[in-house]
């Protein structure tokens, strides 16, 4: 069975609508993807076209192609898990294109994506404390109990303000 057949539900068309939690395969890593794409581009002498602006525009174009797959689908539809094999293959291709361009853009901009994700998740944990955000779609600036800015949602930045109870601005 090829990797693409496995990702689409197997060579015999097994269902991909498992009800349990989903997890990604451990390989390839983001570094593997960066290297594979860099080799692919180098073999074709395409690095000259891979300036950040061009990579970003290609990424946005691929996001548009992904959006087209969802466009005009009814909201009550079960979702991509119930799509035809052809639609699922298109979904897989567009998501792959997006990841490839995202990794290439990050590499070109010298952003270590795994580390950036860890930092961003830490920021999000501070912005969206569980007790204020559980079940809410509110932006952190709109959370209840006076959390009206990132600094307030994350807590006081000035240690002196902790003793007075005032948040510095």
Curated annotation (Swiss-Prot):
Residue numbers binding substrate: 37, 46-50, 72, 101
GO BP term, pick one: dCTP catabolic process
Modified residues (Phosphoserine): 84
Cofactor: Mg(2+)
GO molecular function: dCTP diphosphatase activity; magnesium ion binding; nucleoside triphosphate diphosphatase activity; nucleotide binding
Protein name, UniProt field: dCTP pyrophosphatase 1
Polar residues: bias regions: 14-26
Keyword Cytoplasm attached: yes
Primary role: Hydrolyzes deoxynucleoside triphosphates (dNTPs) to the corresponding nucleoside monophosphates. Has a strong preference for dCTP and its analogs including 5-iodo-dCTP and 5-methyl-dCTP for which it may even have a higher efficiency. May protect DNA or RNA against the incorporation of these genotoxic nucleotide analogs through their catabolism.
Enzyme category, top tier: hydrolase
Catalytic activity: dCTP + H2O = dCMP + diphosphate + H(+)
Stretch list, region Disordered: 1-26, 143-169
KW Hydrolase (keyword) present: yes
UniProt GO cellular component terms: cytosol; mitochondrion; nucleus
Organism expressing this protein natively: Bos taurus
Chief localisation class: cytoplasm
Subunit structure comment from the entry: Homotetramer.
EC number(s) per entry: 3.6.1.12
Binding note for cofactor: Probably binds two or three Mg(2+) ions per subunit.
Entry binding sites for Mg(2+): 62, 65, 94, 97
Keywords: Cytoplasm, Hydrolase, Magnesium, Metal-binding, Nucleotide-binding, Phosphoprotein
Localization terms from the record: Cytoplasm, Cytosol
Pfam families: MazG-like (PF12643)
């Amino acid at each position: 069975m090829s990797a693409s057949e496995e990702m689409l539900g197997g060579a015999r068309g097994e269902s991909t609508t498992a009800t349990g939690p989903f997890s990604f395969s451990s390989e390839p890593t983001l570094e593997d993807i960066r290297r594979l794409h860099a080799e692919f581009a180098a073999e074709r002498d395409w690095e000259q076209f891979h300036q950040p602006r061009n990579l970003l525009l290609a990424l946005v174009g691929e996001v548009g192609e992904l959006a087209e797959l969802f466009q005009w689908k009814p909201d009550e539809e079960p979702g991509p898990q119930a799509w035809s094999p052809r639609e699922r293959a298109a979904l897989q291709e567009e998501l792959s294109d997006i990841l490839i361009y995202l990794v290439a853009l990050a590499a070109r901009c010298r952003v270590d994506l795994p580390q950036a994700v860890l930092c961003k998740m830490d920021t999000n944990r501070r912005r969206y404390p569980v007790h204020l955000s559980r079940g809410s779609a509110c932006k952190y600036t709109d959370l209840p109990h006076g959390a009206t800015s990132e600094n307030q949602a994350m807590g006081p930045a000035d240690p002196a303000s902790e003793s007075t109870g005032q948040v510095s601005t």
